[in-house]
A protein has these predicted regions:
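Sec/Tat signal peptide C-region and signal peptidase I cleavage site
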Residues: 15-19
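Residues embedded in well-ordered beta-strands
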Residues: 63, 150-152
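A ligand-binding cleft/hinge motif common to bilobed small-molecule-binding domains
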Residues: 111-115, 129-136, 184-188
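Flexible hinge/capping segments at coil-to-helix
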Residues: 154-173
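Bacterial N-terminal signal peptides
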Residues: 6-14
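Secondary-structure junction motif
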Residues: 174-192
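Ligand-binding "clamshell"
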Residues: 79, 133-147, 190-193
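Extracytoplasmic small-molecule ligand-binding "clamshell" domains
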Residues: 32-128
Length: 193
């Protein structure tokens, strides 16, 4: 609960400053590590909303887990292979700035973020996390993106359209293990086989 409280409060009081060029892989977006990142000023109103007894994972820092590494435009390593860039890192930086904290981005595996946030290892996970009923029972969410799901097939595939759940029954589909997308597909498949 504390994670989304921090994120929601900070974003509510933070003016949005987003990069204008969003093209990827040599078509407009620089991944140079020395580029000046977007920033915002400390916001006293946001800081005042924090519970008095709140303790950050690392004092003076906003520690954020990111798991979707090298998934532009969300999170991608810069040309130095150390610095993380992308919209999720930008959101984390704006929250940290508005709270007057240094940003501490921690690359992690997808499987690690839930336990890491629950245990206090991370203050937040900003990593393309879909809001689900099960996750809402453990964590608070402050959504910063619309979750749109879709399917891709080879242009030579006999599959020309997937419109409803029964259309995927029996198909072999690649999806990230443990993701919301996997749960949806397994349920659809079970309902329609």
């Amino acid at each position: 609960q504390k994670t989304s409280l921090i994120l929601a409060l900070a974003l509510a009081f933070t003016p949005a400053v987003w990069a204008e060029n969003v093209n990827i892989n040599g078509t407009g977006v620089s991944i140079e590590a020395n580029k000046t990142p977007i920033n915002t000023a400390k916001n006293s109103d946001a800081v005042a909303q924090l519970p008095k007894d709140y303790r950050f994972a690392v004092p003076g820092k906003f520690t954020v887990a990111v798991a979707g590494l090298n998934q532009p435009p969300l999170t991608v390593f810069s040309d130095d292979n150390k610095t993380l860039l992308g919209s999720e890192v930008d959101v984390a930086r704006l929250v940290a700035d508005s709270l007057g904290l240094e940003l501490n981005v921690v690359p992690t595996s997808w499987e690690d973020w839930p336990l890491g946030v629950a245990s206090g290892k991370y203050d937040a996970a900003i990593s393309n996390i879909t809001v689900t009923k099960a996750r809402k029972e453990k964590f608070d969410f402050a959504t910063y993106r619309k979750d749109s799901l879709g399917f891709y097939v080879k242009s030579t595939s006999p599959i020309k359209s997937l419109q409803k759940a029964e259309d995927i029954a029996g198909l072999r589909i690649i999806v990230g293990s443990g993701t919301n997308q996997e749960a949806i597909l397994l349920a659809w498949n079970a309902e329609n086989l």
